[in-house]
């Protein structure tokens, strides 16, 4: 079979991702475009004659980049197409918004690359009484047009057949440009490298006349002639860019008049009715908060019910199983304990996180595909405008509820560097899925019936601190106003189940692989340092270990936030949590249960793997039946109490070490707000610079330490009033000094993003091998 590389391109909300998932299924690979942290997805599928590599390009309305502030999505899509890596393009067009979508289609066809138009969302168009003559549209465009309903899989086989049959577009004159424009486009084309096809050279000439800054990188010496061409055109027309766009829109209007009845179409009544409530200025925000709480309830409640299968199952296989092998093969006791506690304990920490994190990713995917996520940005626009940000900057922040890394990367959709940078600085404060795992364990141990309220308050606190960080930046080092907010609100529709599952699986797989590697390595590392003293001798009590000795020296620093000297395990959790937040649970689990594993004798004769696995299945089934009872729905934290090791020995030790719910909540505040994990730090550095990464770390540490100290000292003021008063005053004075220094430093701060300084044309024009 012949190999074929196809680029999948289309407007945002045109159903491009759903079509990508329909074609490729689980055969996907996610990486980054070379040089920038913009996600690049590739998938594989086969037609009758070809083995196809499908590249999912970022959604864009146009290939024209007017300024360097244009979002990176448009730049990358444009440069991939110009690179010539794609043998064929599939342009996904929303049939219910044909006129707007055809602008990108005309640009692609003018470029001369073989193209197939995938006319998607025909079901929505039919509901709006939109009728499109597919054959007439294909004739007018000069390329195949395949009708699709990607959410239901309709038209997929016809699309594959079109891929096998299509070689080149018909030579159809689409747009009638004014003669002066064609003259100058030919003048510029003659100065370009002659090995480039004439059609592509002429297209680049028109793009340059329209003001596209990145087409100059491909124009060679012709870029030097641009000023001459513009000077000649100035005598004949007012604005060449306006004339080019007007010619294209006239062509689009003529096509739509012939092939469709879009002028008499009826907008979706359901969408209009729901939006009257969802977008209401008074109801919009409460509804958004309710949706966020629903996401939290789903993750805790249903995810927690599935935990026994992953928790008890992993204990049976990776802890008791390793102990059984060790005793059966007569391993030394220290080696058996080391493997069970380090390797087995690490795996046992990762797997119980899967159901809760998976349910959260599923809910986020549902919100994105249903059309609500765009509404959330619209609802939050007024608040974001107060920060000097457009409403769409809240979309990356919402994604942060799943993971902060795509939240930071999502800032690329914003146009202005200042807006991108402010959003990047706010993103780490959004409570990610890994933090949810920590909150659920502490809530079950300390807060009882108030657990749901405690966890939800931490989510709200993260949003509040992100907003306050934005206000601080606006009034100190990043003064400015938000750019005008124009955002398309897609029609509501039921998400496609296959697409939801694939998106959830891709995110969950990335989380488990990333978290698993770190947690297992950290667990083994901690087990080693927990087994030996500073002198290198094996210890019987972990309080005599090297890890305990070093941690006791550092722990007094955290006394103001309620971490006492004998609770050195909590200090270790904060340091390992900087690598990945989910490691905090693994660290506390490893350290708090270490003595139990050492003291409890294991009898290999009593171990039966099948019985333990059946017990895990029975516990899970019982949890699922109990999940939907009224008592559990009223208090979803109950679903997370069956958390294996953490639910028994570790929770008892943890309760004793912290001493109070106030100290535990203060610790959670610090975990929520302090340094981002290593992956987020790397994303911040690549999307901005190392300097801004350092600022994010220091600001997060300050906010976390200050707020946790204030909370704990206020709640425990009666126990030590003098000490509490000193701590509170010290925090206030320090932050006043910090804010004063930031106000003075604003004139010396460079807010230009590292990503915008990179030569995107060079880094995005490579082959698929550059996806890493």
UniProtKB/Swiss-Prot annotation:
<keyword id="KW-0813">Transport</keyword>
<dbReference type="InterPro" id="IPR027417">
    <property type="entry name" value="P-loop_NTPase"/>
</dbReference>
<keyword id="KW-0408">Iron</keyword>
<feature type="transmembrane region" description="Helical">
    <location>
        <begin position="282"/>
        <end position="302"/>
    </location>
</feature>
<dbReference type="GO" id="GO:0015093">
    <property type="term" value="F:ferrous iron transmembrane transporter activity"/>
</dbReference>
<dbReference type="GO" id="GO:0005886">
    <property type="term" value="C:plasma membrane"/>
</dbReference>
<keyword id="KW-0997">Cell inner membrane</keyword>
<dbReference type="InterPro" id="IPR050860">
    <property type="entry name" value="FeoB_GTPase"/>
</dbReference>
<dbReference type="Pfam" id="PF17910">
    <property type="entry name" value="FeoB_Cyto"/>
</dbReference>
<keyword id="KW-0547">Nucleotide-binding</keyword>
<dbReference type="InterPro" id="IPR003373">
    <property type="entry name" value="Fe2_transport_prot-B"/>
</dbReference>
<feature type="domain" description="FeoB-type G">
    <location>
        <begin position="3"/>
        <end position="169"/>
    </location>
</feature>
<feature type="transmembrane region" description="Helical">
    <location>
        <begin position="691"/>
        <end position="711"/>
    </location>
</feature>
<comment type="similarity">
    <text>Belongs to the TRAFAC class TrmE-Era-EngA-EngB-Septin-like GTPase superfamily. FeoB GTPase (TC 9.A.8) family.</text>
</comment>
<keyword id="KW-0406">Ion transport</keyword>
<feature type="transmembrane region" description="Helical">
    <location>
        <begin position="722"/>
        <end position="742"/>
    </location>
</feature>
<keyword id="KW-0812">Transmembrane</keyword>
<dbReference type="InterPro" id="IPR030389">
    <property type="entry name" value="G_FEOB_dom"/>
</dbReference>
<keyword id="KW-1133">Transmembrane helix</keyword>
<dbReference type="Pfam" id="PF07664">
    <property type="entry name" value="FeoB_C"/>
</dbReference>
<feature type="transmembrane region" description="Helical">
    <location>
        <begin position="453"/>
        <end position="473"/>
    </location>
</feature>
<feature type="binding site">
    <location>
        <begin position="149"/>
        <end position="151"/>
    </location>
    <ligand>
        <name>GTP</name>
    </ligand>
</feature>
<dbReference type="InterPro" id="IPR005225">
    <property type="entry name" value="Small_GTP-bd"/>
</dbReference>
<dbReference type="InterPro" id="IPR011640">
    <property type="entry name" value="Fe2_transport_prot_B_C"/>
</dbReference>
<feature type="binding site">
    <location>
        <begin position="10"/>
        <end position="17"/>
    </location>
    <ligand>
        <name>GTP 1</name>
    </ligand>
</feature>
<protein>
    <recommendedName>
        <fullName>Fe(2+) transporter FeoB</fullName>
    </recommendedName>
</protein>
<keyword id="KW-0410">Iron transport</keyword>
<feature type="binding site">
    <location>
        <begin position="120"/>
        <end position="123"/>
    </location>
    <ligand>
        <name>GTP</name>
    </ligand>
</feature>
<keyword id="KW-0472">Membrane</keyword>
<dbReference type="Pfam" id="PF07670">
    <property type="entry name" value="Gate"/>
</dbReference>
<feature type="transmembrane region" description="Helical">
    <location>
        <begin position="383"/>
        <end position="403"/>
    </location>
</feature>
<feature type="transmembrane region" description="Helical">
    <location>
        <begin position="427"/>
        <end position="447"/>
    </location>
</feature>
<dbReference type="Pfam" id="PF02421">
    <property type="entry name" value="FeoB_N"/>
</dbReference>
<feature type="transmembrane region" description="Helical">
    <location>
        <begin position="518"/>
        <end position="538"/>
    </location>
</feature>
<feature type="transmembrane region" description="Helical">
    <location>
        <begin position="309"/>
        <end position="329"/>
    </location>
</feature>
<feature type="transmembrane region" description="Helical">
    <location>
        <begin position="664"/>
        <end position="684"/>
    </location>
</feature>
<comment type="function">
    <text>Probable transporter for a GTP-driven Fe(2+) uptake system.</text>
</comment>
<dbReference type="InterPro" id="IPR041069">
    <property type="entry name" value="FeoB_Cyto"/>
</dbReference>
<dbReference type="InterPro" id="IPR011642">
    <property type="entry name" value="Gate_dom"/>
</dbReference>
<dbReference type="GO" id="GO:0005525">
    <property type="term" value="F:GTP binding"/>
</dbReference>
<keyword id="KW-0342">GTP-binding</keyword>
<feature type="binding site">
    <location>
        <begin position="35"/>
        <end position="39"/>
    </location>
    <ligand>
        <name>GTP 2</name>
    </ligand>
</feature>
